[in-house]
């Protein structure tokens, strides 16, 4: 695993420029994102499904790095974004056995950009709570103050970005 220490200093466009100019390898951003998730998520609880193998396979299939975000890792919100052969739980244990047979339009568009879906972010049950504290997974913590939770249906995404 190759960790790109300055990963957090760049946005997606900046990372794409580094990849295209061969200053970093296409695998560096993904390895760095995985490292951050593994180090920070036990404390934050913002990623409820890790899809590292899928992301690596997507990168291997896109050797030509096609798409404006080719090689850039991302989290997919686990709410109304179906991902083929994976559950879409929407923060609920009720849907734990609901495997989606297809990528929905939004997921297909993300894939077309070349982005690598490396996980699904935490959401409150069905997006109906003002904080991200689903019974199934437990609360998502604010990275700036872990005594607090994150709010809204994008709490997992918000915590991941803020971390």
Residue ranges, per PLM feature:
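Gly/Ser-rich catalytic/binding loops embedded in alpha/beta enzyme cores
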Residues: 2-163
